[in-house]
């Protein structure tokens, strides 16, 4: 039997949205379809894969719907950690279905499963004292200050656009469902995991996990996963064709390998 090759593939949340005119669920599904075609190519070449993905734009949409529903119909708002879980399920569904379809048409006997994944962060991570990650929509100053007083939000002003909530971006310490992911991989099942960097949780004094309002960098979480499963390859999929130096400047230059 040939030696197994392990790969962790991190898909950018923005790579599921081609441009501002292609943001619908169907648009994202079609982008996922294209991505899964390439992943299936790797699997056909003998790779066992775990797939991580970003969720920034998708969580932004979920939060916006929540804010509108709250203002218009008085619906309860959705906490950030639950938004992350929602997006893991939705994006995982799109990837899972497209991979299953690829396997069927290629006659590959393979299964794929999405794992709703929690990632432990340190409640004393310095980023909690200096949150910088903007989330949600813009607010006027009165609304922003009300949120600060009543809900303990951190907010910043964006000149000319209003106020916006900011949250911490702590480093990932431990993947709670790692054993589940490892079991899937050991049995030849593709695992979709650490979506959006994982749902950030902290541990209380009694050893219980609690969701927290934060955003974990999906590349850090996927890198941690690659280390833990001793992957042979860590691959990051983005919306651009290659790595650039001086990105988005007149001096931008692609790096070829």
Q: What are the language-model segments listed below?
A:
Residues 1-50, 62-68, 183-186:
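N-terminal glycine-/serine-/threonine-rich phosphate-binding loop
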Residues 9, 51-53, 108-116, 191-195, ...:
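General beta-strand structural signal in soluble alpha/beta enzymes
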Residues 17-18, 60-81, 129-190, 194-257:
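Active-site phosphate/oxyanion-binding loops
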Residues 22, 87, 93, 145-147, ...:
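An N-terminal domain-start capping segment
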Residues 28, 32-35, 84-92, 173-178, ...:
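Generic structural signal for well-ordered, non-membrane alpha-helical segments
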Residues 32-42, 95-98, 219-230:
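Short, well-ordered amphipathic alpha-helical segments that serve as non-catalytic structural scaffolds
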Residues 37-131:
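Glycine-rich nucleotide/cofactor/substrate-binding loop typically near the N-terminus or early
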